[in-house]
Regions:
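Boundary at the C-terminal end of the N-terminal hydrophobic targeting segment
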Residues: 19-24
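Residue-level micro-sites within transmembrane alpha helices that shape
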Residues: 2-3, 17, 260
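Bacterial N-terminal signal peptides
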Residues: 8-18
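Bacterial N-terminal signal peptides that target proteins for export
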Residues: 1-9
Length: 361
């Protein structure tokens, strides 16, 4: 699957170092918004696609509209084009995509249908009627790391990671930095599965981590398998994409949760009002402006620690930078100077780790 493989390179470089001073003219659709969503996977996958599905429902409820949906549309032009064009032929004029691999096809379709608005989650292409959007996931993983550090008895955390890309590495580092806010001696051992969605590999990685004496497992993969393994082993876990406590109620202490509706609702309103100005560099969303948030904290997290997580979340909303300096990597090299903040360009290409992180393949 290529859904997010190159997002770290393409969207990051599109955003990097460019002040968003140039904006397109407001987009004006023909008629009122009629919205459709194209899901990469099944709407009940327990992770990425289900998070979009739940956001779709919340958006419907908030706006009092119906949003049509088609699921299981893979990342090939031969699959994307007919699905989108069928919606357009039926009068839909706002199309929401959910995959990096839709990027090129969405760009072509946006140019072909200039009176249709296109939005694409984790996409990389933008235009006068097209905006890609993603989130600063490291903020939520920093907070989940704090919860993990609070429940760990040994200070040994694990992390089931998909691929060694910046978009994953920044979550691992943030997780460890958050944990050390609670336990300065905490460590995080990460195992890469090489896949975004492979329950077999995720189980193997989670079991390997548990076998090393790790007592909290985090994740940046799609399925809830690491949560399930954690509960089987009698240890704790933190989730990704959705609140995963439904799969492991005894293990789960925190999850990154996508609330795409916080972006979709105001954007669709602007489209309907004729005031939407899609960013030429895409939308890179923080907690404060509709990016991923958290479901926290589980009952096993001490109240004092839960209060600290809540306070840190508010601090991030108020402007605290997770990757603010001074910050050095695990080899002692300065990565962010005192008073500085890591640039978006450096975030997306992150290939280094903070002290306390151990990586395995």
């Amino acid at each position: 699957m290529i859904r997010r493989v190159a997002t770290c390179a393409a969207l990051g470089l599109a955003l990097a170092g460019q002040a968003q001073t140039a904006s397109a003219a407001p987009f004006k659709p023909e008629g009122t918004p009629k919205v459709a969503m194209v899901l990469y996977g099944p709407r009940t996958d327990g992770g990425w696609s289900q998070a979009f599905e739940e956001s779709r429902v919340r958006t419907e409820q908030a706006l009092g509209i119906q949003i049509a949906v088609v699921e299981g549309i893979k990342e090939s032009a031969s699959a994307i084009r007919p699905a989108v064009e069928l919606f357009i032929k039926r009068g839909y004029n706002v199309i929401i995509g959910t995959a990096f691999g839709y990027s090129d096809a969405f760009k072509e379709l946006a140019e072909k249908y200039p009176k249709v608005a296109f939005l694409n989650g984790s996409g990389t292409t933008n235009g006068p009627n097209l905006e890609s959007f993603y989130g600063r996931t490291y903020e939520s993983h920093y907070l989940c790391g704090m919860a993990a550090g609070a429940v760990s008895k040994e200070g040994k955390l694990g992390f089931v990671a998909a691929n060694p890309f910046g978009v994953v590495n920044w979550t691992i580092n943030a997780y460890e930095m958050g944990a050390r806010q609670i336990n300065p001696k905490a460590t995080t051992t990460a195992i890469y599965t090489g896949s975004w969605n492979d329950p077999v590999k995720e189980r193997a990685a989670a079991e390997a981590l548990a076998g090393q004496g790790i007592d909290v497992i985090g994740q940046h993969v799609d399925t809830p398998t690491p949560q399930i393994v954690a509960q089987e082993k009698g240890i704790h876990a933190t989730g990704h994409h959705r609140d995963m406590k439904e799969f492991a109620p005894k293990a789960s202490v925190c999850s990154l949760v996508w609330f795409w509706d916080r972006y979709l609702i105001p954007t669709i309103k602007k489209i309907g009002a004729g005031t939407w100005e899609p960013s030429p560099y895409g939308a890179f969303l923080s907690i404060k402006d509709g990016g991923p948030d958290i479901a926290c904290c589980g009952a096993d997290v001490p109240k004092e620690a839960a209060d600290r997580v809540k306070a840190e979340r508010q601090a991030i909303i108020d402007g605290k930078k997770v990757y603010g300096g001074p910050l050095a990597d695990r080899d002692g090299k300065e990565r962010v100077a005192a008073g500085a903040t890591l640039s978006d360009a450096d975030l997306w290409k992150m290939d280094w780790f903070v002290p306390g992180v151990v990586t395995q393949r």
